[in-house]
Amino acid sequence: MIWHVQNENFILDSTRIFMKAFHLLLFHGSFIFPECILIFGLILLLMIDSTSDQKDIPWLYFISSTSLVMSITALLFRWREEPMISFSGNFQTNNFNEIFQFLILLCSTLCIPLSVEYIECTEMAITEFLLFVLTATLGGMFLCGANDSITIFVAPECFSLCSYLLSGYTKRDVRSNEATTKYLLMGGASSSILVHGFSWLYGSSGGEIELQEIVNGLINTQMYNSPGISIALISITVGIGFKLSPAPSHQWTPDVYEGSPTPVVAFLSVTSKVAASASATRIFDIPFYFSSNEWHLLLEILAILSMILGNLIAITQTSMKRMLAYSSIGQIGYVIIGIIVGDSNDGYASMITYMLFYISMNLGTFARIVSFGLRTGTDNIRDYAGLYTKDPFLALSSALCLLSLGGLPPLAGFFGKLHLFWCGWQAGLYFLVSIGLLTSVVSIYYYLKIIKLLMTGRNQEITPHVRNYRRSPLRSNNSIELSMIVCVIASTIPGISMNPIIAIAQDTLF
């Protein structure tokens, strides 16, 4: 009895503190109000988990989703405000950073309903899973607003540590343990290389850590063309390359995709790329302003390797998740075109637009993999044969997302790639755009091969997995379908109304 009274008092006191802090932040303003909402959500998750039983599990999902939606709302209310630098220059808020934060929050918001049924069926620890997702989201948001080299290093570590834990969440699975080990080792090595690059920038600029001050320091010390800057550029490119996973920094991607829980893969496949892209645009554009030719060349090489290797190797894959891993390597090659073009020819606007479409296309495809995998226990591409005869909605939604990934008109992926390639062509990247067009045709081949399997109607070609396919009786199945419907709509309809989306993206340029 005393224990229950103490718990009730603890909850009441914590709620009062939460409401007071919320009131102060809401009416007195804050540079990191959206991030604070997620922090309060994390605190509430811990409170409910420590003071309740299993019957309160729906509240955990509700609090997580509500925190993310409220954070998105706070970002939208802050739209078009004047850029601000806070925390002694460590953090900057402007429209450009906030659009990437919005994309990260959107990814997390869609991933939570996508994960509900998987967590229930596999009996994973729910609270810890949600805590890691929200904390990783928080790290990604801080990375988008980072304005100095220390924050750019610390923020992705917050994201990465949660990613390592999520990838090894099914600890009884040997493949998951192997994926986590590779992910951790590669992540640690890349972080070391990234710090090495920042140390060269720090020394060459005369001890500066803020991005703009590094440029001023390089001018004062006359070190902007020194060999140390070249070493810094190569090291930082390698470090960021691990997060973006372009070739040849892609070795960890297929194994982590295959061994990690599917909802985790869905989350990592988009959030890490969005956060790393936001960081890359600022790092290459500001500290390496005087080395633009050099980093353009480096990124062009990475883009070409990614588009060619990613799409060619994807053809040979038999696992759906490994195929999407190599597909994502090719997709990041297209995104790099936007980074190279920059804001002079709407490169950043086209990159942001394409990443918005990529989120919906990729998460829609992973929602189908989660749903099919829970009912059949397989991830083999051939086992999808004849799915249309058992679940037309799942097969058709999968086909739309795959066609959009391939870039077929009139879907969103086509218009996203078209605008991205057009911006690259206007910027004079003729060879890079030509490679992108050719590899896009290659990607259409393996996407259509999967769609052909999905639509197979002849009984002799339907696999035993599909013959025994049964729709789930769980209520949580609706949450996967909800995520899938949202992603399918976002993968199709926005292509018809590209101009408003491009205009919004153009308004974000710093």
UniProtKB/Swiss-Prot annotation:
GO terms for biological process: ATP synthesis coupled electron transport; photosynthesis, light reaction. Keywords: Chloroplast, Membrane, NAD, NADP, Plastid, Plastoquinone, Quinone, Thylakoid, Translocase, Transmembrane, Transmembrane helix, Transport. The chain crosses the membrane at residues 24-44, 57-77, 99-119, 124-144, 150-170, 183-203, 227-247, 295-315, 323-343, 347-367, 395-415, 418-438, 484-504. It comes from the Eukaryota. One of its GO terms (molecular function) is NADH dehydrogenase (ubiquinone) activity. One of its GO terms (cellular component) is chloroplast thylakoid membrane. Belongs to the complex I subunit 2 family. This is NAD(P)H-quinone oxidoreductase subunit 2 A, chloroplastic.
